Amino acid sequence: TPGKTQLINYFEIKFKTNDVENPYVYARFVDLPGFGYAKVAKSLKASWNRNLTSYLEQRPNLQIFVHLIDSRHPNLEIDKNVDEFVNHIKRGDQIIINAFTKTDKLNSSELNKLKRDYPAGIFVSNLKKIGIIELQNKITEHLFGN
């Protein structure tokens, strides 16, 4: 639910490799607060914004920003602001992946329009397990070059 995450949550993921000496590599996924959606005081949002900016700018190991966008509402101001913000602070070695969620809720013409409007996007449905492998591949390709 948008706005429910109010803390930074970390998830360490183990990836299996073909290297006998190093059979696993690890990546940490970080779930950041969706501060644009949260129903909290403006002063708290301002504090989150400062802390988030500092966090993102001071982490040289951050490689990928995955921006989850509700495919039913792809042009929300908050999503445009997030995209602009991340593009402003990201380094040349970092990428942004726009992952459009809940694509199962769109009819075929709506989905086709979304794909035309956002050709670099990845279109996913957790419910129908659509696009999940493509998203995983995009992430692992950037992280590990495979």
Where are these regions (language model features)?
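Hydrophobic aliphatic residue packing
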Residues: 1-2, 30, 99, 124
